[in-house]
């Protein structure tokens, strides 16, 4: 240190420096080939299996049981010879002492903030189900190309050892007869929720072929977490009591026979029939699951998006507060119309002919072309609809990459909610063109909308409970760790990626991700490879630290001094995860200097995000704990130093990121 140098040590005793303190608490249709190929990036090629279901279901609303006949055309597009196949039998989880039951009760023994860690919707309820309340799926017969096949139950998985292997690049036909009992509503699928009073929420209701991909079979037992399915086409016919009204995946093919707002004439009621049961015929193409719901008292709202957009269906039951309830569900339909142009602008076109928001016994829970909702809350409504992009159209293996499903959905939901709030405000202020302005804007969206996700991440990072994002969804030690990892840390991943590569580049990435990987089951490496291509930066380090470890980010302002006619700011990395740094200096005259310090592992720096002049400095080597920034102004003119003024970097100790100097 030079003699007469002005030196300020941050944190030193009797320092005249004060800090800003930031307090954070824990809290359809296939797209055309041209659509995917008309871009400047190389197209991914990966084989995928393909299914075509034809199912005929007869539902007994007295016994709550159904019988079904299923024909499954299965195309083995892999280079492998398949000696066996697997089916999911999800209803079998709803039996006392099932894996789901025991797992829930074991999690309930662990207390976080004096509360059991189990899902409050599940708790120990499965243990107490009576014989006529449990769920089950039983296979009566199973044939492949007309030949009976031996099978073995593994609770929620059916193993079929084939009498003749399925050769590569061949197609076989499985025919099955099965019966099932719909469980009392516990989680997702079921009947007779006493709160919503919806009779049937029919998700995970049929024997579903397990996905086989480049990593092999994925016969994941059902313990209430995530899903993964084979893309294909569903043709489903349901016979049920004639007074019941249905909604679900796909298009209603016999709408003219049904009426009730589905038909062209918009008939308000079900068309009268003399038979005791009515047949509903749905077809959903290029989806990886099929959901339906049924209740005799459903109301039905519809909206038609302009420019050949999808039909929006809203099915709901009235509560005692009829007027308020109907207004709330009407807002669901209207909100969907308002936000879809914004969604498609930023995340890609919705390709299916309809979407149904359905009052169900549990939810929100997302499915292709439909979601189940326990109520009309718009936050949940938007979240579940955004799952149409991050899962229903991209189809990652949720068990392995829950953060790419829930996290990206959470990220998108925050932006769509903010847009909707602005739209409502604009309408109240009489600006009829404001929505279009916002939709077409290229503004940098900073994490004000994402603040709760940052708070939740900080909580889990400091709790000692955090586990890496690479943990299989079923195998997190706590529900808290799973939930925050998949939702909050996944959302922060995407916002923070915008900090690293620049928000406009991140937004371009999201559209390219949709264009290149829709209907192709991308994994995290596929995403990062594309991110590197779009940004021109190396990002493997980001995935390694953020996804594969629980190392945290913590940067601090260490010291200030003058030396040889220049002022100096020393920054220090205290956390174990290195990052690029945005730095802002504010002076007494109101001027500011903005710097970006790339991480050497990036082999480049992000482009300017706004018209604000930014100086790109030499890269900070990850091996070096400190970095010095020099500037010409006198140190006595400096008022404030800020690391990451946009607050997009998930620094677990924000208080040492800002230094305000009181001279």
Regions found by a protein language model. Name each.
Residues 209-216, 224-382, 411-414, 423:
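Hydrophobic helix-coil surface modules that form long, contiguous segments used
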Residues 252-256, 504, 517-663:
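Non-catalytic accessory/interaction domains
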Residues 84-147, 243-244, 586-599:
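Solvent-exposed beta-hairpin/edge-strand motifs
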Residues 99-112, 179-234, 647-663:
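Glycine/proline-rich low-complexity spacer/linker segments in large multi-domain proteins
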Residues 40-67, 96, 539-541:
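N-terminal, polar/Ser/Thr-rich
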């Amino acid at each position: 240190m030079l003699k007469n140098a002005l030196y300020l040590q941050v944190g030193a005793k009797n320092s005249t420096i004060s800090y800003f303190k930031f307090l954070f608490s824990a809290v359809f249709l296939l797209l055309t080939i041209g659509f995917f190929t008309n871009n400047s990036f190389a197209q991914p090629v990966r084989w995928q299996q393909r299914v075509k279901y034809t199912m005929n279901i007869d539902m007994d609303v007295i016994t709550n049981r159904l019988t079904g006949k299923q024909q499954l055309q299965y195309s083995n597009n892999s280079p492998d010879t398949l000696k066996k196949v697997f089916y999911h039998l999800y209803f079998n989880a709803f039996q006392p002492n099932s894996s789901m039951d025991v797992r829930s009760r074991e999690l309930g023994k662990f207390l976080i903030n004096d509360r059991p860690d189990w899902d409050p919707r599940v708790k120990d309820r499965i243990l107490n189900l009576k014989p006529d309340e449990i769920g089950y799926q039983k296979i009566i017969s199973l044939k492949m190309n007309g030949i009976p096949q031996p099978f073995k139950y593994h609770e929620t998985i059916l193993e079929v050892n084939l009498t003749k292997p399925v050769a590569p690049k061949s197609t076989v036909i499985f025919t099955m007869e099965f019966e099932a009992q719909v469980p009392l509503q516990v989680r997702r699928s079921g009947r007779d929720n006493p709160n919503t009073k919806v009779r049937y929420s029919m998700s995970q209701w049929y024997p579903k072929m397990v996905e086989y991909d480049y990593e092999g079979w994925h016969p994941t037992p059902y313990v209430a977490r995530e899903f993964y399915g084979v893309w294909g086409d569903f043709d489903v016919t349901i016979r049920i009591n004639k007074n019941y009204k249905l909604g679900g995946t796909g298009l209603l093919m016999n709408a003219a026979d049904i009426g009730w707002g589905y038909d062209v004439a918009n008939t308000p009621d079900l068309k009268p029939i003399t038979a005791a049961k009515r047949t509903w015929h749905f077809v959903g193409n290029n989806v990886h699951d099929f959901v339906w719901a049924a209740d005799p008292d459903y109301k039905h709202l519809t909206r038609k998006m302009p420019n050949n957009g999808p039909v929006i269906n809203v099915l709901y039951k009235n509560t005692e507060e009829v007027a308020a309830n109907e207004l709330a569900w009407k807002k669901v339909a209207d909100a969907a119309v308002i936000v879809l142009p914004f969604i498609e602008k930023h995340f890609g076109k919705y390709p299916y002919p309809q979407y149904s928001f359905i009052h169900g016994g549990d939810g929100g829970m997302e499915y292709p072309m439909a979601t189940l909702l326990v109520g009309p809350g718009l936050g949940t409504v938007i979240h579940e609809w955004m799952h149409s992009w991050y899962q229903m159209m991209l189809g990652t293996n949720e068990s392995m990459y829950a953060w790419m499903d829930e996290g990206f959905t959470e990220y998108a939901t925050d932006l769509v909610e903010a847009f909707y709030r602005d739209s409502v405000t604009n309408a109240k202020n009489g600006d009829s063109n404001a929505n279009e302005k916002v939709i077409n804007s290229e503004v940098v969206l900073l994490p004000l909308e994402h603040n709760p996700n940052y708070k939740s991440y900080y909580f889990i990072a400091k709790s000692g409970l955090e586990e890496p994002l690479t943990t299989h969804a079923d195998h997190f030690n706590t529900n808290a760790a799973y939930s925050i990892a998949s939702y909050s840390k996944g959302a922060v991943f995407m916002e923070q990626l915008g900090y690293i590569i620049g928000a406009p580049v991140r937004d371009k990435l999201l559209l390219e991700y949709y264009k290149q990987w829709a209907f192709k089951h991308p994994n995290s490496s596929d995403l990062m490879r594309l991110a590197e291509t779009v940004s021109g930066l190396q990002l493997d380090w980001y995935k390694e630290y953020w996804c594969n470890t629980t190392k945290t980010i913590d940067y601090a302002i260490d010291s200030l001094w003058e030396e040889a006619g220049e002022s100096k700011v020393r920054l220090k990395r205290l956390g174990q995860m290195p990052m690029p740094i945005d730095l802002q200096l504010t002076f007494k005259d109101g001027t500011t200097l903005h710097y970006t310090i790339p991480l050497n592992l990036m082999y480049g720096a992000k482009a300017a995000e706004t018209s604000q002049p930014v100086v790109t400095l030499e890269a900070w080597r990850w091996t070096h704990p400190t970095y010095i920034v020099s500037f010409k102004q006198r140190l006595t003119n400096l008022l404030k130093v800020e690391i990451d003024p946009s607050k997009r970097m998930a620094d677990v100790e924000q208080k040492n990121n800002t230094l305000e100097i009181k001279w």
